[in-house]
Amino acid sequence: VADGSAHHPEFLMRKRWIALIVIASVLVVLVAGLYWAGRSLFHMPTAKGVDSVVGELGGERVLGVFAHPDDEQTVNGLFWRAKQHDGAYTAMITATAGEAGHQVPVVARQEDLGVVRTAEALKNSFNLGVDEHEVWEYPDGGVPEVDEDELVERLVEAMKRIEPDVVVGFWPASGATGHKDHMEMGRVTELAIAQLKEEGGAYDGPGHLVYTISPTTALSMFGGEQGELVVENQPDPEYAMSAETGKKHEGWAIHASQANYLQSAYYLPAWLVYLLWDEEFYHVRDLATDPID
């Protein structure tokens, strides 16, 4: 006589549970694999993990030099930890009001965008604990056409007043995103530091110049031609630190006119980007051993 236990309700229920557990386990493994594969796109193997780049350098006064409102979104972690962990004095300069930007979503009249984005930048830097922030009036998208001597002189005067020992900015050949305004402000930053050293005054420049570096694999996949330009022209980073992704999400909420920028530019929503990209990467130039000529 055949054993009827195989058709018993309890036996059938047990089989279903076993099947569900197996399926769930496979899904967990697949999701975990996809997660770590995604994280690898934003990993930079040359970078050593540190709690704070500014703390690692012994910085006490930090100046960030940028081109547009929202550029500070690349360095949230560095500035937040410089203030909260290291007690550093922090300052920012943004060269343009971002008036030529594309609104994603549209939140204001286009003719008012410069005013709106200036306010967004000032509010975001305040949210990062930044002590002072100047937004200049140079044309968005036209920084390379501005008289370079004027830009350098203005930055020199600002640096003499702030006296930063760490300056944070863009690598001139890549600008983190390939934007020409970023690249020019990176060049102007180097020229200003060189001029301060040449003048040899009471304040003769910072001890370290820190460049924000973009993750190469992700840029190669999602950054298009500009991403390739960045990958081919930026140096490898020596340091990685927490990106303080909570502050990045807060920053995009503050930058309401650019809130959907990541999805618009790279086809990935911000929540997914920062789930995978939770570190900032930096190349550091020790100006005592490697001065700017």
Regions found by a protein language model. Give the residues of each.
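Active-site rim/loop-helix segments in enzyme catalytic domains that contact anionic ligands
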Residues: 11-23, 30-162, 190-199
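The feature marks non-catalytic terminal segments
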Residues: 24-33, 199-293
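Histidine-centered active-site/metal-ligand motif
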Residues: 68, 179-182, 255
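Short, well-ordered beta-to-alpha junction loops that form the rim of enzyme active sites
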Residues: 137-138, 169-173, 213-214
